[in-house]
Each structure stands twice: as structure tokens, then as C-alpha cells.
Amino acid sequence: MNIRMRSITIKKCLVMLLLIISSNISIAQDCLDTESYYQYIKNNGQPHLEYVLDKIRSHSVVSLGEDHWIDVHPQFLCDLITASAQDSTANIDAVAVEFGSERYQYLADSLIKSPVYREDLVFKILQYTPDDLGNPYKEYADVFKSVWENNQKKPENLRTRILLVDPAYIQDYFDGKDYVYTGSRDDNMFDIIRNYIIKRSHIVFYAGASHTLARINGTRQGDYYYNWPSAGFLLKSCYPQDVFIINLWGGQMGSKGYIENNQTRWNLIADGVIDKAFQKNGNKPVGFDLKDDFPLLRTETYFANPTIKLSNYGEKGSPYAKEQKLSDICDGIVFIKPVSEFNGIQLINIYDNEFIEKANKRTKGSCKTAEDILKTVKEWHPILQF
């Protein structure tokens, strides 16, 4: 190779190297400094219940994103319902929950109208949730009870309704029946909640974070991605001034529940950098907005999970961009208490004979009793407690 050709080759290599370096620099790096998060929380935080009540006063929809299968988040919802009932300026017109099929909305309405608490109606609702064997969870049942009990203390025009927002056809799908697809689960959530925004009502939308956050979700199918908008994305896109999205702080979630860790009990988000900031703040329950000056935390880091890989960030067709920040899909955070103090949700027997027979068919004969069902649910999610 002559000197001229060698010089051209070297120049090309240098150009390629500069392009690679510049592309990496263009993706901002996460802030992994506990002190920065602590100062932000100290300067911007307020008591967690009052924080959410303020958002209810100023928005039609306040979305609360929970971690499934743990006790603290639905317990917080119960506390919020009680606090709202004591302040008519922050009254909740309806609580929209993921754990209930719209097919059984009449049961939720019957509960609200009943002069006595009807646990049988609640258990019936929890049998027909978007899980094959229902949601036999005490803390979910407590949400219904909290709404009913607090309604007894309020005038009828201020009573809170419970909205069941999972589409009806899901139950037919579980049973192997023919069904009419009416849209995704997120589409259905959006359709129901939108009707209340139009009425200028105040709604608390409580569901898993994959539904409440304003993001596009996706899974790889064959050679490309199947992407769909979350209910939070649809709500925030259509009504940006009316919807406020809060994520409830928690641990690192796997497909079966929180991921165990010998040092911290559960794997912590971003290796515990922000949890240490909460600790430095006295582990006080706190809520705060994710403003422009919130230390940078990318969604890839926030949702990092060593046990599963749903989609590659930055891959062609993937809805997950490496540069996407948590503040792009979420408006605020509520910290309740240290994640190490979180426990699995408590299993309870909600099953009647009709559903046990249905569950036995759904599991091809492996769930013949309520005890069999609870044992199976526990096997699916070992974090759950008896």
C-alpha cells in the first residue's frame, strides 16, 4: 500500500471512530450520585398523601402505577381513599382499577349501593380479573372495603364509584370460548376513563405501571416488534393538562415478583442509588414532581432486569429508546417506605364452587379445590404470603 492510500485509510478510520464516539456521547448518562437525588427530594418533596391530594384537586385523572404482588402499594391506595374522604376539596369521584372485569361492573355498583358491606360481591369480582385464577389478594379486597366504608361517611353526591376497567372478552379467552376482540386492555382502560374526563370528574386510575406510564410497550414477535400504546400514553397524549402520572416507588420487578437480594432483601432500582437518597431524607414518605432539573434517570436503567429481556433498547422497531428519560413517561414519584420493608401480598380464599369448576377446566384438571388454586398462584408468584 502506498503512502497516499495509507493516509486515506487512516483518515477514514479516524472519521469512523469520531462518529462512534459522538453517537455514544449523544446518549446522556444516568446520574448515579445519591447526593444529587437527596438534594432534589429535600427541595421539591412534600408529604406523600398531601402531594397526591394536590394532584387530585388540579387534574381529572391521577394515575398511580403499582408493582404487582406486593402489599405496600394497595395499602397506600386505601390510605389515599381515606384521606380524600376527609377533604371534600380532593374528593375522588371514581377509582378505576385493573383488577376487575367490566363484565362485572354491576357487582361493584351493587356494593357501593349496599347498606352493608358485601364481601361476597368483592370476592366474586376478584375471581374474574385479568389472571387465569383471579386475584385472591387481601390487599385488593381491602381497596373495595375502604371505598365502601369511606362512602358511608360522605353525602351521596360525593360517594366514590369503583370502575372495573379490564375488557369483558378476557374471561372468554381464559375459558377457551369464542370472543369478540374489542381492543387491547389498555384501549379499554382509556375508553372508560375518557368518559369521566369529559364529565370533568376526578378519577384515580390504579393499575400496574406498564398500563399507567405514558409509554409504548412492545414485544418481539418473529423478525419484528408488536408495539402498542399504554392507557397512560393514550390518556396523556389526548389530555396532557388533565392527566398526572405518578409511579409508586418500589423494587426491581421480575416475572414472578421482586428479585431477591442477599444484601438488600430485594433488588433495588439503579443499584439503590435513589433508595440511599430516601434513606438520607429520613425515609420519610414523600412525593415529588419529575421536573426538568430532576437528576437524569433513563427508563432503560429504571426498568433494568437481569432475569428477563422483553425488548432491546435502541433496536430497530423497538419502542424503547436508549435516550428516553423516566420524566418522559412519568410526572411524579411517591415513596412510601424502604423497599426492604415491602412484603408479598396476602393470599385469601375468594373462591366459590362455580369458579373452582371453571379454574379446574382452565388448568386442565390440576385445580380441584380452593387450596389447589391458592397453591398454584403461590407457585407462580413465590413472593405471595399465606
Predicted regions and their residues:
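Compositional signal for N-terminal targeting/processing segments
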Residues: 27-386
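Bacterial Sec-dependent N-terminal signal peptides
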Residues: 1-33
